[in-house]
Each structure stands twice: as structure tokens, then as C-alpha cells.
Amino acid sequence: FDDQRAWFCERVNENSGGLYWLAKSILHNDEDVKDAVQDSVLTAYEKLDTLRDEHSFKPWIMRILANTAYSMIRRSKPNTDIDSLAEELPAPQNEDREESMALWQAVRGLGESLRTVTVLFYYDDMPIKDISRALGITEGTVKARLSRARAKLRIAMSEQEETL
């Protein structure tokens, strides 16, 4: 029992950054993000016996988190404009601060579905297969969303360069 608890805690710690980014890309509000991550970790621990393969822990817990976050959105005010809340997403740290900020601003401007897969793929280095399982969508859908996101980001960044 203690070994299982220790193993679970290690996996959660290893994935804490990814859990945060996924929750933040869906919920945006820091308090909601904390609640979603906490609720998801508790749910995952309670349902640990449903994890079929320990190597699938990351997509499994990400899926639990995504479901929790989307449930929180459904329970929240129906008039909440989720895309406008994207302004609250923090910028990642990078050597080229100005370009990084411009890119992050463009990522924040993406719609929720494109932004979520972009954050998981590029900021959390999650493989397409794992994103697919975590979000409950096909790998083809993940690839299509990444392609659309890249196209939109290319346009946004070229417009950004023109204004400089």
C-alpha cells in the first residue's frame, strides 16, 4: 500500500507541470486550475486500480484532468467567454523574451481546442498518441488541430513581424 502511494506520488510529481499547463489551457483562472488539478489527483488516486498499464499513467491522468476541467466549465456560468479568459495564461520563459512573448500571445489567441493541443504538444512535449488519449479524440484530430494551429500561428507571427 505504501509502495503504491509512493509510486503514485512520484508519477504526479513528474507530471505536475503538464497537469498545470493542461488545466491552465482549458480553465485559465488560477483558482479553478488549482481546484481541477487537486480534484483530478484525488480522483486518479481513488481510481488507480483502473490504470491498466503503468506506462500509460500520463495520458490516463491527463484524461481525468481534462474531464474534470470540462465538467467545471459546464457547471460554471453559461455566459463565461472562455476565449477572453485566455489573456490570463502565463508566458513561458525563453531566452529570446520578445519573440517568446509574441509567440505566446499568438498561442493565447487560438481557440480553446487548438490552444489545448498546442500547449500539450509544444510546451509539455506530449506525444500525439498521448494527447489523443488524454483528450478523448482521435490522433487524426490532434494532427489536424496542430496543423491548423501552426497555420494560424504562422500568420499571426508574420503579421507581428510586419508591425515591427
Please place each PLM-identified region on the residue numbering:
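A short, charge-rich alpha-helical start-of-domain segment used by transcription regulators
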Residues: 1-21, 37, 115
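Σ70-family region 2.3-2.4 aromatic/basic alpha-helix that recognizes the −10 promoter
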Residues: 24, 41-45, 55-78
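DNA-recognition helix of helix-turn-helix
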Residues: 66, 70, 135-159
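Short, small-hydrophobic-rich alpha-helical interface motif
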Residues: 19, 23, 33-44, 64, ...
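C-terminal flanking helix
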Residues: 16, 20, 41, 111, ...
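Amphipathic, Lys/Arg- and hydrophobic-enriched alpha-helical face
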Residues: 11-30, 47, 107, 158-159
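A short pre-motif secondary-structure segment
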Residues: 117-121
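Internal acidic/polar
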Residues: 71, 78-107, 127, 162-163
